[in-house]
From Swiss-Prot:
Residues 224-242, 249-263 have a biased composition (Basic and acidic residues). EF-1 is composed of four subunits: alpha, beta, delta, and gamma. GO terms for molecular function: translation elongation factor activity. Residues 224-273 are annotated as: Disordered. This is Elongation factor 1-gamma. Probably plays a role in anchoring the complex to other cellular components. Residues 281-442 form the EF-1-gamma C-terminal domain. It comes from Carassius auratus (Goldfish). It holds the Pfam family GST_C. InterPro entries: EF-GSTs (IPR050802), EF1B_G_C (IPR001662), EF1B_G_C_sf (IPR036433), Glutathione-S-Trfase_C-like (IPR010987), Glutathione-S-Trfase_C_sf (IPR036282), Glutathione_S-Trfase (IPR040079), Glutathione_S-Trfase_N (IPR004045), GST_C (IPR004046).
Length: 442
């Protein structure tokens, strides 16, 4: 498993790709984005840094073994696992296709449109209007592709999704207001599905979509430009005047720099404070003795290893029958299910709203059948012996749309169901329909 340091500046969307990939693969990644570990504009110009990364660009990766990489896509690829890169030659090629698509089709128009709104590029009306049209074309391509798909390649998040999401991030945050994104519902549905995955959230935090399209701010642009030296004619004020004016100007510049930095620091503090305050809510499982079954370790095995030969044996070898329970759930209203992608949205929507339950649960939920003839059922593993949803108001979401049956962990029925639902393969005799696609809550 890879282990190393990623050098970057804060909020670098190119670095986000590598960070999210590491969240999925389990790669041990240290982030150097602040002094003394890394100061952008200084550290990356030092001889020591340039000897490993000749261009002086970030993100840049240095492994604990001394292995060095620059270019964000290469770093993200290196930190991924086989599931993210594409487990077959075809899937791997498709992942590369979408990574290239992001670089060549999304980034140029996104930069031309978004950068002026951030004050880091001069506004050009013709260039901006052209960029908007190119973004529409890109979104139309994605919308068509995602019409019958949950993710860009295969049935799980891949490096394709990570890369394209990060490339669209500032568009969604700055300029894609509701009216503009309305014709592309599949793209927005997919984008929200991705950014609400715990691995994305760990890096991006809570992503808020743009409510009103940001516009070019001439004042902000002027503030972002390098300060010019005071004209020589001001020396007429005398030596003392010059001496007084210079420190004042420096103070003003320092204050402006502090003001620019302050919002990011305050926002981070608020975010961290909010996250820190969440666990203080009453834990429904606080009364239970510590379990020998480490849910997070099983989830890592499931994500990174073969299900049948590694993850499943690990599950049964370590499963705590007293501290955990296994439940079978079946959607109550199969007659209301229509298009497959809409049925999948029911599942992912429930998962997203149950985010606070993740550390105490695991589930594999499957859509069976085809359009207008389908059903949904799944296997859930909960902490404790009771159905989790009734234990906390935060968890009472969508569960009443399902019937729930606690399984006997020693029964052959339970062992067969766990195997089939976790592996997404088998006869599924109790269903009577073929496997369509599955979703994992972890």
């Amino acid at each position: 498993m890879a282990a190393g340091t990623l050098y970057t500046y804060p909020e670098n969307w190119r670095a986000f790709k590598a960070q999210i990939a590491a969240q999925y693969s389990g790669a041990r990644l240290k982030i150097a984005s602040a002094s003394p570990a890394f100061t952008f504009g200084q550290t990356n110009r030092s001889p020591a840094f340039l000897s490993n990364f000749p261009l002086g660009k970030v993100p840049a990766y240095q492994g604990d073994d001394g292995f060095c990489l620059f270019e964000s896509n290469a770093i993200a690829h290196f930190l991924s696992n086989d599931a993210l890169r594409g487990s077959t030659p075809q899937a791997s090629a498709q992942v590369l296709q979408w990574v290239s698509f992001a670089d060549s089709e999304i980034i140029p128009p996104a930069s031309a449109w978004v950068f002026p709104t951030l004050g880091i590029m001069q506004f050009n009306k013709q260039a901006t209007e052209q960029a908007k049209e190119e973004v529409k074309r890109v979104l139309a391509v994605l919308n068509q592709h995602l019409n019958t798909r949950t993710f860009l390649v295969g049935e799980r998040v891949s490096l394709a999704d990570i890369t394209v999401v990060c490339s669209l991030l500032w568009l969604y945050k700055q300029v894609l207001e509701p009216a503009f994104r309305q014709p592309y519902p599949n793209v927005t549905r997919w984008f929200l599905t991705c950014v609400n995955q715990p691995q994305f959230k760990a890096v991006l935090g809570e992503v808020k979509l743009c409510e009103k399209m940001a516009q070019f701010d001439a004042k902000k642009f002027a503030e972002m430009q390098p300060k010019k030296e005071a004209p020589a004619k001001k020396e007429k004020a005398g030596k003392e005047g010059g001496k007084q004016q210079q420190p004042q100007q420096e103070k003003k510049e320092k204050k402006k720099e502090e003001k620019k930095a302050a919002p990011a620091e305050e926002e981070m503090d608020e975010c961290e404070a909010a996250l820190a305050s969440e666990p203080k809510a009453k834990d429904p499982y606080a009364h239970l003795p510590k379990s020998s079954f480490v849910m997070d370790e099983f989830k890592r095995k499931y994500s990174n290893e073969d299900t049948l030969t590694v993850a499943l044996p690990y599950f049964w070898d370590h499963f705590d029958r007293e501290g955990f329970s296994i439940w079978y759930a079946e959607y109550r209203f199969p007659e209301e299910l229509t298009m497959s992608f809409m049925s999948c949205n029911l599942i992912t929507g429930m998962f997203q709203r149950l985010d606070k339950l993740r550390k105490n649960a695991f589930a594999s939920v499957i859509l069976f059948g085809a359009n207008n003839d389908s059903c949904i059922s799944g296997i859930w593993v909960f902490r404790g012996q009771e159905l989790a949803f009734t234990l906390s108001e935060d968890w009472q979401i969508d569960y009443e749309s399902y019937t729930w049956r606690k399984l006997d962990v020693d029964s052959e029925e339970c062992k067969t169901m766990v195997k089939e639902y976790f592996a997404w393969e088998g006869e599924f005799k109790h269903v009577g329909k073929s496997f369509n696609q599955g979703k994992i809550f972890k």
